[in-house]
């Protein structure tokens, strides 16, 4: 995190801070306004609303009729036009895109284990087509990464694991052809299990979300930084507290208010020499924009 000044004295470079656009649950225009308030120009964007005809925009509250353009209006086209206008005029850069299957069921830990990511056979062909289009969009937006949850990694199911690895290799190869890197988000696997998978998948990397490890009850995120260090390319800044009941979700909190241990986590990133984007994400709470602004301010203080 250091750069040389004109006097030759080393000075720490400012941290690279971005935001997850989907956290705002708002239109691109409103997201742009919030980003301007906090002086951030790099955003992570969900790709699926623009490539999956059955997806919903983050600001529609799940009202699919708005996505289909009922009444002669096409909000998807308008959102994409606004995004691409912000990219063209230099107001925005896309740090990462997100592919998330619309079949993911986060009701319980068990439901997401069954339905999440690229694992379910019944949705693979559809997901394969959608993720291919999402990769093309990622390249068009000049984003270096596309992020997804692989799904439940079960090392005891050799046939199932081999199938998942084949699917990830397919997606990785599509990414390579497009000049994009595939990053898997930490979630329902331990750091050791994810590292074992990645060791067999050259060219696949990690989006490290420390809160997810806590929400799923999958270990200490600070230790996990060291385990996954060779693969970490992108970071979500998010906090959470562990569940007191095994088998149930933990709870998300404001950044620095949970069990991640912000000081130790940032120190761990510095220790491994991470200098990529720290993307603030908030998926709970009544004032997401305010919470994200406070997280951005906190990160900027940590020079």
Regions found by a protein language model. Give the residues of each.
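Short, solvent-exposed loop/turn segments at secondary-structure boundaries
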Residues: 56-57, 71-75, 122, 157-162, ...
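Active-site acidic/histidine proton-transfer and metal-coordination neighborhood
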Residues: 104-205
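Small/polar loops that bind or transfer phosphate-bearing groups
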Residues: 20, 182-186, 257
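A short acidic, helix-capping loop that chelates divalent metal ions and anchors anionic groups
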Residues: 51-55, 105-107, 154-158, 215-216, ...
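N-terminal pre-domain/capping segments
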Residues: 1-139, 143, 176, 296-303
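Histidine-acidic metal/acid-base catalytic patches
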Residues: 2-18, 24-41, 88-91, 169-177, ...
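Active-site-proximal loop/turn and secondary-structure-junction residues that shape catalytic pockets
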Residues: 23-25, 47-49, 100-103, 150-154, ...
């Amino acid at each position: 995190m250091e750069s040389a000044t004109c006097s030759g004295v080393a000075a720490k470079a400012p941290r690279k801070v971005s935001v997850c656009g989907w956290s705002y649950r708002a239109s691109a225009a409103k997201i742009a306004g919030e980003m301007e308030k906090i002086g951030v120009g790099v955003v992570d964007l969900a790709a699926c609303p623009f490539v999956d005809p059955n997806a919903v925009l983050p600001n529609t509250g799940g009202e699919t009729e708005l996505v289909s353009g009922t009444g002669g209006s096409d909000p998807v086209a308008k959102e994409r036009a606004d995004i691409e206008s912000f990219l063209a005029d230099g107001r925005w850069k896309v740090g990462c895109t997100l592919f998330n299957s619309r079949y993911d069921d986060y009701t319980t830990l068990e439901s997401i284990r069954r339905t999440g990511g690229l694992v379910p056979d019944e949705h693979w062909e559809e997901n394969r087509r959608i993720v291919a289009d999402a990769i093309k969009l990622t390249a068009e937006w000049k984003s270096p990464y596309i992020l997804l949850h692989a799904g439940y990694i079960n090392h005891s199911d050799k046939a199932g694991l081999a199938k998942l690895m084949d699917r990830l290799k397919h997606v990785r190869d599509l990414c390579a052809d497009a000049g994009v890197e595939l990053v898997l988000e930490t979630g329902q696997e331990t750091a050791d299990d994810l590292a074992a998978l990645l060791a067999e998948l050259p060219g696949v990397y990690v989006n490290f979300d420390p809160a997810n490890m806590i929400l799923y009850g999958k270990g200490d995120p600070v230790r996990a930084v060291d385990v996954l260090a060779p693969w970490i390319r992108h970071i979500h800044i998010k906090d959470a507290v562990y569940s007191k009941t095994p088998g149930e979700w933990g709870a998300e909190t404001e950044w620095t208010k949970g069990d991640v241990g912000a000081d130790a986590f940032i120190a761990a990133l510095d220790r491994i020499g991470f200098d990529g984007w720290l993307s603030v994400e908030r998926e709970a709470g009544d004032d997401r924009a305010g919470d994200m602004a406070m997280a951005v301010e906190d990160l900027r203080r940590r020079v």
